[in-house]
Amino acid sequence: KGKGSEDGRFIGTNILNEAFLERFAITVEQPYPTAATEKKIVMGSMKKYGEVDEEFATNLVTWAEVIRKTFYDGGVDEIISTRRLDHIVKAFTIFKDKMTAIEMCVARFDEDTKESFIDLYTKVDAGVMTSEETEEKTEEGVENEF
């Protein structure tokens, strides 16, 4: 709305003066898509990348919605965008592991935010194992072979 970003989060979003803003007759706000629409977008990405998992798509959308609500309520400083969900889907097709994909795509956030986002996903998708749990299980399997 012309107020810019002084925290450095968005480069090039300077505060615009009122005379310049007055040249625009309308302002359009683009909210995030509804859960149903966003799920269609995520499913489309999955089809595009050749890895369709409807339950994972539903869980990703639910997870993003909870984070956005928390962001708007002032509880966190970061947000999960639809674009980031697309990145997670793409990473999932590469690594074939949900948590690895999520962890790789939230790695740019600070440690507390990253940990809270990952922890939240494990609550949304109760059947998923964190990378640490997967590693421990793999190590146990290797030890049991010998």
Question: Which ranges hold each PLM region?
Answer:
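C-terminal regulatory/interaction module of P-loop NTP-utilizing enzymes
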Residues: 1-146
